[in-house]
């Protein structure tokens, strides 16, 4: 069973509710597919769900899925599964921090609507690259083996 946890935002704590069963099922599916997809890739490392990742000197988040560069530990891709109970922390607060620190890829996974918003970093912040739902496929060209349909992810 999941437990509540805390993230660090500008030196203060950001308490988070324990993820629910559906949240954890979606997280497990993402991790399973990503683990298979990066097998043999030496440049990236998949962290365990909600491993604390340093974003800035006084800010550390616990993404549901985090891919970091193996050589530097720098966050490359973060996936946040939005919780109905405290969605503002993910959809506003953390997204702004990810944007400020130019995290290259951000997936906002929304079980409320069974969709995923994909953001790519560019020189002015994060840009919405697409919103996927239904039979559409979540994929990342920098991890070419990773592919999962929205129906599979949210089943």
Could you describe each region identified by the protein language model?
Residues 1-155:
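Gly/Pro/Ser/Thr-rich low-complexity, intrinsically disordered segments predominantly at protein N-termini
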